Amino acid sequence: GSANIKILDIQRSSVSNVLNKFKDQFYLTSINENKLFGVYTTSSRPGELATIEDGKIKVLSEFNEIVLSQYSLGKTNEINYQAPDGTDVQGWYIVPPDFDKNKKYPLVLIIHGGPHAMYRPQFNYLWHQFASDGYVVLYTNPRGSTGYGSDFANVIDNDYPGQGDLSDLLAGVDHVTDLGFIDEDNMYVQGCSG
């Protein structure tokens, strides 16, 4: 999913992206001429103060370095898969820091609330804690999520929770399980309000 920062040029009646192929998260807080100020986070880095200027991100702070230097984090991997009816779904999974593809790990499926919300590859302390405790953490954007167009978000109208979003979530579990490192007897679900 995407929620890009865009510039609207009223004189030219044009819209352009501030960053191309941006997959992380930037919480915009202020604009000064051509410079944007905010908080920048990735799937493996908590938020830091940053600017965007001339299409480039510059991180200004290192508030989290003291804490991060004491821990090993698991790697976050993006996945794209299809539900049984052919619907394309995007998600991510985090593996434990000492991940070994030949071992079996318990799985935690994280489900977002909303339903009109979406996950992005942003840092989440709880998810990294689960991964540090030896779990694979899966989070996806099933039907009803924003960031994939209004048709994808609104397909669940009058059907939430419904078969489409459930099918998408279960297909994500199947996709990660098929990778061969999930203990199918130890799967858990954690979610937010819906």
Question: What are these language model-derived features?
Answer:
Residues G1, D9, N32, F37-S43, ...:
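Beta-strand C-termini and the immediately following turn/loop, strongest in propeller blades
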Residues G1, K21-V39, V67-E78, H128, ...:
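Conserved beta-propeller blade repeats
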Residues G1-K6, K21-K23, Y40-A50, P142-G144:
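A flexible loop/linker signature enriched in serine peptidases of the S9 family
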Residues I5-I7, Y27-T29, I57:
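Short, exposed beta-strand/loop patches in secreted or surface proteins that constitute
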Residues K6-I10, I52, I94:
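Hydrophobic/aromatic beta-strand positions that recur at structurally equivalent sites within the blades
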Residues S14-L19, V59:
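A short beta-strand motif characteristic of beta-propeller blades
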Residues G55-K56, S61-C192:
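Cap/lid segment of the alpha/beta-hydrolase catalytic domain
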